[in-house]
Design a protein with these regions (language model features):
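Aromatic-lined ligand-binding clefts that engage carbohydrates, nucleic acids, or primary amines
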Residues: 90-109, 150-152
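Polybasic, lysine-rich low-complexity intrinsically disordered segments
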Residues: 5-7, 17
C-alpha cells in the first residue's frame, strides 16, 4: 500500500497497481507528445543561409564506379575505391558527408588530396581506434565535372563490400535529413532511458512501504543504462555530440555497467539457489568489458579482436536474459505467476531474436547496423510488461 503523502509532481493513490498503470499511461502520453514535437521541429526548422546561397535539396550520389579487389594489401587491409564526376554545384561550395566504420578515408580531386582521416589501422592503441565517424568536406564550385575519388581502407571484408551513403548539399540540411531518418531509433532509445529514470524516481519517492520491492529500482537502473547506451550509439547523435573519443569511452563503460543490477538485486530477481549462476555471468561480462577498455588503452588488443568480443558479450547478455526467464518460469511453476512467467519468457526470446537480428544486420550492412531498433523495441515492451505485472516479492 502506498502512502497518501503528497509530493510535487507525483500523484499517489491507495491502490498500488492502479498507480503503476496511471504513471505508465502518463509516461506513454508524454513520449507520444515528444515524438510529434520532434517530428514537427525537424519538419519546420528554418535553415539560415548566406544571401548568395541558393535553396538546394540534399542529393544522394549513386553513380559511383566502385573498384575493390577483395584481397588484402601488404598490411592486411582491404581497399575500396569510389569514383564519380563531380555534379553541378549550385553555390560556391556544398558539403559532402558520409558515415564510415573501421576505415581510413582519403578523398582526391584529379589526384589532388583534399580530405583525409586515419584511424591508424596498423596501430593497436585505443587512442588510434576511433573507428566510427562522419566524414565531411567541402566540394567547391571549381570541382564541377572533375573526377572525385574516395578511397576507403579497412580491416574488415564486410565493411569493404558495403558502400557508404554519400550525401551532397547544405550541411544543416544533411543533418536534419539524418535526424528525420533516425527519429524512430532516437525515440525508442529515449523511451527506454526515460522509462528507467521514471522507475528510479518512483522507487525513491513512493514511500518506505514499497522499499521491499527491489524489482522497480533494478529495472530502472538497467533501463537507464541501456537506453543511454542505445542513444549515444546512433550515428547522427555521435555527429551532434562531436567528441568521438568521449563517446567511445562512455559507450564501453556503460555497456560494462549493464550487469550491475543483476549483481546488486539478483536475490530479488530469482530464487536464491539460482542467483549465483546469474551473478557469475554478470561478473564475467563486466570483467570482459572493463578488460577490453584497458587492453585497448595499453595497446594489447586490436580493433578486430575488440569487435568480436563485444558481440560475444551481447550474445552472453542474450543468454542471461533467456536464463532469467526460464528460471523464473521454473520457480513459479504451479503458482499464480506461472502464466506471467511464460509471457516473460516469450518476450525474452523476442529480445534475443531482436538482438540476433541486429548483430546479423551489422555484419551484412555495417552502415545500417548500429541503431539496434529490434532490440530497443523488444526491450521496451518487456520493461513495460515487467513494470505493470504483479510481483510476489514485495
Amino acid at each position: 500500500m502506498v502512502s497518501g503523502k503528497k509530493i510535487p509532481g507525483v500523484i499517489f493513490v491507495k491502490d498500488e497497481n492502479d498507480m503503476n498503470k496511471k504513471i505508465l499511461a502518463v509516461w506513454f502520453v508524454l513520449l507520444i507528445i515528444l515524438f510529434f514535437f520532434l517530428k514537427s521541429g525537424f519538419t519546420s526548422v528554418r535553415v539560415m543561409r548566406f544571401s548568395e546561397t541558393q535553396e538546394t535539396t540534399v542529393r544522394e550520389l549513386t553513380d559511383w564506379k566502385v573498384s575493390s579487389s577483395g584481397q588484402k594489401d601488404e598490411n592486411g587491409n582491404y581497399i575500396s575505391t569510389y569514383t564519380i564526376k563531380v555534379p553541378l554545384i549550385h553555390n560556391s561550395s556544398e558539403t559532402m558527408m558520409f558515415y564510415t566504420t573501421h576505415s581510413d578515408v582519403s578523398v582526391y580531386v584529379e589526384k589532388e588530396k583534399i580530405y583525409t582521416v586515419s584511424t591508424n589501422l596498423s596501430e593497436k592503441t585505443f587512442q588510434a581506434v576511433r573507428s566510427d565517424r562522419w566524414n565531411q568536406f567541402s566540394v567547391e564550385k571549381a570541382y564541377e565535372g572533375k573526377q572525385l575519388q574516395v578511397v576507403l581502407k579497412t580491416s574488415y571484408k564486410s565493411v569493404a563490400e558495403q558502400a557508404p551513403l554519400f550525401l551532397l548539399g547544405n550541411e544543416l540540411d544533411i543533418v536534419i535529413r539524418e535526424l528525420k531518418a533516425a527519429l524512430l531509433s532516437m525515440f525508442l532509445a529515449f523511451a527506454v532511458f526515460a522509462c528507467g529514470i521514471a522507475m528510479c524516481i518512483y522507487y525513491v519517492f513512493s514511500g518506505k512501504s514499497r522499499l521491499k520491492n527491489y524489482r522497480t529500482i533494478y529495472l530502472g537502473i538497467f533501463s537507464a543504462f541501456i537506453g543511454f547506451w542505445f542513444l549515444i550509439n546512433i550515428p547522427i547523435v555521435q555527429f551532434l555530440f562531436g567528441n568521438y573519443m568521449m563517446l567511445e569511452y562512455i559507450s564501453y563503460l556503460i555497456f560494462g555497467m549493464l550487469p550491475i543490477p543483476f549483481i546488486l538485486f539478483e536475490k530479488q530477481i530469482i530464487d536464491q539457489k539460482f542467483g549465483w549462476l546469474l551473478s557469475l555471468i554478470a561478473v564475467y561480462i563486466m570483467l570482459v568489458q572493463t578488460g577490453r577498455v584497458v587492453l585497448q588503452m595499453t595497446g594489447y588488443m586490436d580493433l578486430k579482436e575488440s569487435q568480436t568480443i563485444i558481440h560475444v558479450v551481447i550474445l552472453l547478455s542474450i543468454a542471461m536474459f533467456i536464463l532469467l526467464g526460464i528460471v523464473n518460469m521454473y520457480v513459479n511453476r504451479g503458482s499464480e505467476e506461472s502464466l506471467i512467467s511464460r509471457v516473460n519468457v516469450i518476450f525474452l526470446l523476442v529480445i534475443a531474436a531482436g538482438s540476433g537480428i541486429d548483430i546479423l544486420t551489422y555484419y551484412m550492412y555495417p552502415q545500417r547496423g548500429k541503431e539496434f531498433n529490434c532490440s530497443k523495441f523488444a526491450l521496451l515492451l518487456y520493461i513495460c510488461l515487467l513494470y505493470t505485472s504483479p510481483s510476489s516479492r514485495d
